[in-house]
C-alpha cells in the first residue's frame, strides 16, 4: 500500500443509543469520547441511533402491512363495469 493514501483504521466501539448494546469493530471513524470496553482497554466511542440489536427487522418485532387487503379494496373501488 502507498503511504498517506489510505485512511487510518482502528478499533472503535459502536454503542446503540436505544438499548446500550456495544460492538467492537474496525472503522475509519474516530471520536474524542472514549469508553472502557469489557476487555479492559479504552477505545473511541461512536454512539448510533439503531443497530441490529434494536432494529425491528432483526429483533423479530416488525409488523407487516396487509397489502393484499389494500389491493383488493382498490380493485373493488375502481373496477370497470
Curated annotation (Swiss-Prot):
GO biological processes: translation
MF terms in GO: structural constituent of ribosome
Coiled coil, from the record: none
Record key words, sorted: Ribonucleoprotein, Ribosomal protein
Record's keyword annotation contains Ribosomal protein: yes
Record keyword Ribosomal protein present: yes
GO cellular component, one term: ribosome
Gene3D superfamilies xref list: Ribosomal protein L31
SUPFAM superfamilies per record: L28p-like
Similarity remark: Belongs to the bacterial ribosomal protein bL31 family. Type B subfamily.
PANTHER family for this protein: 50S RIBOSOMAL PROTEIN L31, CHLOROPLASTIC (PTHR33280), LARGE RIBOSOMAL SUBUNIT PROTEIN BL31C (PTHR33280:SF1)
Assembly and binders: Part of the 50S ribosomal subunit.
Descriptive protein name: Large ribosomal subunit protein bL31B
Amino acid at each position: 500500500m502507498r503511504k498517506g493514501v489510505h485512511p487510518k483504521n482502528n478499533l472503535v466501539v459502536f454503542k446503540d443509543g436505544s438499548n446500550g448494546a456495544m460492538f467492537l469493530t474496525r472503522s475509519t471513524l474516530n471520536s474524542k469520547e472514549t469508553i472502557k470496553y469489557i476487555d479492559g482497554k479504552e477505545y473511541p466511542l461512536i454512539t448510533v441511533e439503531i443497530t441490529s440489536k434494536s432494529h425491528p427487522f432483526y429483533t423479530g418485532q416488525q409488523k407487516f402491512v396487509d397489502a393484499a387487503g389494500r389491493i383488493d379494496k382498490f380493485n373493488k373501488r375502481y373496477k370497470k363495469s
